């Protein structure tokens, strides 16, 4: 007879871990106990040596589906120390300090789906059905350990039948904290109306069927929903939400419905129908003009559509119910918020912000503690490439194997905000918060930071934030009453890529995005940095240009285009002639802009790669203005991709005009990538009538060549052979592939993002990593 004390670390709460341990104990024929300690699960296993060994093998090889075991510690203990165990028991949770791992929310499992649509089951059509394998976790959690009384389900006492299942080791709901049924669980209802339960769901389905718009409360917040096959309904939602062109996310009935509209490979299907169920950006199928399905206005001008499957029971009931209403196979399911505001999470917010955008509000009385917008995932070379990391993924920690000790908070960026809490080598990125230009989002950030600090039981020693003095994220960090460390935006991008790839040594960082406050007070965004966790050096950039017109220039790429053309010609008349030839803007608009350039009025020096893409899109006549962030740049990418599909070889630009053979030098002697010469070439070829798609492709290829050549020259100086690619521009998969392949041909080792976004949704990780190193160095 032996006794072992076992501690299991990882995602072991809210995933049915203790019931699974109990079943393994029974199968192996051992006695003992299992207790949730908060940071870990503690097990005592007592029995014959072969039985205990069998139990440990089962524990390691057959964990619950949703668990993530990071490590298992075992030690022998004496029987007299803990006594003899007569059976195997699940002991009430105890609170213990240590490493903490919180489970994200888990999509409805197959077993619960079957029960929900079984007329003989007592949870038939129950909108909140769940078990140990699925259901809300992070979004209902007040504190750890994960038990019902520390969740928003504490307001719903279990009925005798649910309590019986909860206490029975033989059931799937043994120790399932959110367990409930139609008799004792939360209830759906229409706000401001009498319909509740069944009547509310039927009214919602009828409204959507008839072309209406409904706000629907899910797991992490509200969605705005309408029939995605109804052009009139989608256009009305666009008008109400003031969203003329930005793609809407779609929820499909099932995998087969997705395959009707999109090309889906095995990897994508597995993720699409997995337990996280993010929005996947999938390529649209080519369809005939008279085919039915998704209407064009869902994702206009985009070769892809963002699509997901139902992950909450109430969402499944929208598609299938016993009321005889035939619902479409596709629903628009876009975030329930007004422009710039965070996703609504309660009735008060929904009524105030969404009432004018919808015909009904379907809510429920289970409180959402933490907002969690949908995650968005693209694919690159067959692998996941995260665009927005939120529901289903947050707050799973990123592990970095640096010998760091301490606790830090990073406030993240101003746009696409997420924050990050670092504890030693573990970094917990929050769900998506949003754009902090809106004070409601700032408030949401502050609330979520406080809740995460409580949940993870941390007291940060340092707050990290962006270098920009006027960012609201900077203000939030400064108001925490902690020492503040400010990190340059693009340096944080590169550190986030290093941390995700667990790179400890120096890299050449290629940080390409829309904007970031530089150490010299100008706008950066097309940078080559030499970086490690101690600091960075700006080694190069794209050619600086005047960004005229302030914030509006980010939406009107033609302004940057005029500035770039003028920078090349240095002649007003010649510039106006070119602008007229390519129909870039009116003559009066051009004159005003040139005058502003001469006087440096409302103009700032910039090396923004994002604005460069916008300008090229305008020059080529693809998009002169953007109605949403990245619209012009995306259109340029799509045009280049369309050309690549048609033609495999292109003509080289004449006389090497766009080549990077002669880099310019700024006063500080940094390498300058000759993007100005590339603009000159593209403008000339456009006036000659060369196909815009071809020129878009040439732009991508030549920019990739400039980046590769710049990295090669930096390597010659520094001997650094690792390159990290980060920043929102690298969501452009064509540029990413061209740069990566170009660097690999030069025998560089290339680091890129995978499950941490390359955009500003990932920079909090880089900020936190720097702050952790800052603590180690005792700065």
Question: Where is each model-derived feature located?
Answer:
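Intrinsically disordered, low-complexity, mixed-charge
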Residues: 1-178, 182, 189
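Internal gly/pro-rich beta-alpha loop/helix module
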Residues: 62, 165, 323, 327-402, ...
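A phosphate-binding glycine/aspartate-rich beta-alpha loop in the early core of alpha/beta enzymes
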Residues: 76, 159, 221-286
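Glycine-rich phosphate-binding/hydrolytic loop that grips phosphoryl groups
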Residues: 491-512, 516-518, 557-566, 701, ...
């Amino acid at each position: 007879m032996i006794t072992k004390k076992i501690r299991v670390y990882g995602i072991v709460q809210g995933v049915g871990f203790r019931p699974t341990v109990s079943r393994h104990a029974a199968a192996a024929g051992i006695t003992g106990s299992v207790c949730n300690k908060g940071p870990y699960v503690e097990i005592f296993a007592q029995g014959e040596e072969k039985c205990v060994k069998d139990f440990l093998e089962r524990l390691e090889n057959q964990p619950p589906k949703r668990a993530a075991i990071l490590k298992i510690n075992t030690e022998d203990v004496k029987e007299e120390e803990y006594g003899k165990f007569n059976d195997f028991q699940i002991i009430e949770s105890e609170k213990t300090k240590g490493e903490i791992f919180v489970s994200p929310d888990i999509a409805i499992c197959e077993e619960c789906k079957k029960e929900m649509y079984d007329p003989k089951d007592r949870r038939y059509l129950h909108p909140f059905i769940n078990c140990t394998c699925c259901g809300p976790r992070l979004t209902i959690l007040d504190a750890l350990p994960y038990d019902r009384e520390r969740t928003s389900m504490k307001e719903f006492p279990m009925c005798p039948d649910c309590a019986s299942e909860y206490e029975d080791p033989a059931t799937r709901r043994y120790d399932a904290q959110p367990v409930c049924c139609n008799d004792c669980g939360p209830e759906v209802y229409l706000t401001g109306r009498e319909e509740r339960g069944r009547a509310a769901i039927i009214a919602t389905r009828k409204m959507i069927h008839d072309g209406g718009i409904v706000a629907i409360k899910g797991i992490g917040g509200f969605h705005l929903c309408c029939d995605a096959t109804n052009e009139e309904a989608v256009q009305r939602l666009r008008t109400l939400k003031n969203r003329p062109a930005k793609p809407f996310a779609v929820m499909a009935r099932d995998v087969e419905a997705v395959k009707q509209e999109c090309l889906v490979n095995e990897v994508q299907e597995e993720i699409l129908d997995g337990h996280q169920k993010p929005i996947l950006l999938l390529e649209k199928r080519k369809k005939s003009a008279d085919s039915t399905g998704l209407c064009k206005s869902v994702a206009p001008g985009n070769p892809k559509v963002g699509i997901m499957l139902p992950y909450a029971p109430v969402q499944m009931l929208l598609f299938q119910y016993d009321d005889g209403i035939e619902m479409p196979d596709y629903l628009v399911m876009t975030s329930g918020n007004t422009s710039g505001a965070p996703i609504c999470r309660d009735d008060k917010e929904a009524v105030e912000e969404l009432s004018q955008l919808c015909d009904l509000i379907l809510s429920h009385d289970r409180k959402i503690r933490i907002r969690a917008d949908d995650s968005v995932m693209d694919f690159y070379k067959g692998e996941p490439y995260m665009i927005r990391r939120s529901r289903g993924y947050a707050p799973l920690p990123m592990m970095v194997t640096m010998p760091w000790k301490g606790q830090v908070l990073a406030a993240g960026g101003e746009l696409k905000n997420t924050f990050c809490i670092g504890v030693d080598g573990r970094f917990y990125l929050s769900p998506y918060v949003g754009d902090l230009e809106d004070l409601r989002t700032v408030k949401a950030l502050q609330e979520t930071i406080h809740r995460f600090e409580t949940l993870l039981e941390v007291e940060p020693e340092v707050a990290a934030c962006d270098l920009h003095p006027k960012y609201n994220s900077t203000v939030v960090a400064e108001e925490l009453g902690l020492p503040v460390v400010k990190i340059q935006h693009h340096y944080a991008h590169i550190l986030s890529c290093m941390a995700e790839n667990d790179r400890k040594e120096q890299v050449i960082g290629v940080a390409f995005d829309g904007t970031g406050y530089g150490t010299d007070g100008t706008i950066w965004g097309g940078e080559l940095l030499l970086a490690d966790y101690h600091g960075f050096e700006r080694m190069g950039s794209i050619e600086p240009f005047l960004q005229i017109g302030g914030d509006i220039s980010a939406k009107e790429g033609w302004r940057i285009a005029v500035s770039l053309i003028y920078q090349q010609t240095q002649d007003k008349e010649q510039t106006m002639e070119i602008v007229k030839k390519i129909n870039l803007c009116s003559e009066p608009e051009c004159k005003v802009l040139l005058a502003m350039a001469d006087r440096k009025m409302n103009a700032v020096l910039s090396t923004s790669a994002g604005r460069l893409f916008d300008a090229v899109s305008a020059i080529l006549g693809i998009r002169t203005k953007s109605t949403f962030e990245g619209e012009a740049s995306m259109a340029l990418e799509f045009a280049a991709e369309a050309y690549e599909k048609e033609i495999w070889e292109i003509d080289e630009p004449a006389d090497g005009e766009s080549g990077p053979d002669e880099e310019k030098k700024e006063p500080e002697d940094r390498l300058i990538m000759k993007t100005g010469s590339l603009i000159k070439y593209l403008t000339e070829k456009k006036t000659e009538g060369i196909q815009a798609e071809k020129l878009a492709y040439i732009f991508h290829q030549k920019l990739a060549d400039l980046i590769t050549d710049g990295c090669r020259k930096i390597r010659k100086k520094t001997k650094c052979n690792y390159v990290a690619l980060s920043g929102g521009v690298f969501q452009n998969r064509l540029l990413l592939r061209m740069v990566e392949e170009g660097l690999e041909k030069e025998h560089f080792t290339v680091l890129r993002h995978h499950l941490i976004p390359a955009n500003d949704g990932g920079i909090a990780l880089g900020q936190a990593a720097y702050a952790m190193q800052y603590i180690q160095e005792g700065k």
